[in-house]
């Protein structure tokens, strides 16, 4: 029996394993996919914006007033803390013109490799292709390549994500075997803006618009967008 069983090998699960293994707990980290951090790697294809290099009070303006539950998390792991943590993995960073912080490699794979390597050195047990199907007290039953397997732990930490990308592991099937967990209905949080363009915009589909400012009420964002057939999308939104 391990001290902590962590279910989900995305950034939340990896960070939990990173923190708890530093405190010398025995950790088993499982994921239903063949490898961990798949959506994290996909995020890195666009450069992997990790945080913003700006005063903390200004940084908070990047978040909606409707998300006060984020405040304590942001205070406990500030942009400076994020940068210190990344550099502790041997990853070099740079700050872009809008204050966004990126790894110099402009991708996630070097960071993920260093992260997993540190977990391995601390003795974290990593298991793949482990699909959780039922919970019984402090034991979790999994479907594996070799049949069903039960793992018991003193504590179980769920870091299974939402329903954003089934192909990369975020399928929200945990709702079926955790029926007593209350959750809000899943909805997209990173979306474009639909616009019914007039015909003369056709020739601009796929074109970026850079170094702009967008406003919605009191909220302002600086960045860039891309004109698409159905509207606009990109980091600025």
Regions found by a protein language model. Give the residues of each.
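Glycine-rich FAD pyrophosphate-binding loop
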Residues: 21-45
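Predominantly flavin-linked oxidoreductase catalytic cores and closely associated redox partners
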Residues: 109-110, 115-237
């Amino acid at each position: 029996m391990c001290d902590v069983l962590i279910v989900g090998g995305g950034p939340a699960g990896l960070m939990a394993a990173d923190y708890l293994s530093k405190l010398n707990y025995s950790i088993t980290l499982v994921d239903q996919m063949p490898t961990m951090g798949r959506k994290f790697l996909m995020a890195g294809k666009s450069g992997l914006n990790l945080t913003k290099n700006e005063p903390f009070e200004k940084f908070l303006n990047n978040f909606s007033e409707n998300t006060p539950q984020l405040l304590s998390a942001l205070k406990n792991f500030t942009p400076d803390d994020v940068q210190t943590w990344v550099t502790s993995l041997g990853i070099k960073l740079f700050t872009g013109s809008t204050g966004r912080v990126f790894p110099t490699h402009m991708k996630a794979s070097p960071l993920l490799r260093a992260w997993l390597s540190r977990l391995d050195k601390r003795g974290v047990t990593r298991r793949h292709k482990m699909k959780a199907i039922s919970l019984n007290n402090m034991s979790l039953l999994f479907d594996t390549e070799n049949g069903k397997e039960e793992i018991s732990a003193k504590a179980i930490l769920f870091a299974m994500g939402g329903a954003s990308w089934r192909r990369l592991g975020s399928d929200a099937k945990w709702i079926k075997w955790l029926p007593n967990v209350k959750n809000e209905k899943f909805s997209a949080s990173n979306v474009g803006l639909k616009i019914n363009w007039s015909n003369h915009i056709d020739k601009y589909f796929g074109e970026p618009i850079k170094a702009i400012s967008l406003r919605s009420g009191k909220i302002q964002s600086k960045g860039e967008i891309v004109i698409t057939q159905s509207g606009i999308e990109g980091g600025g939104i």
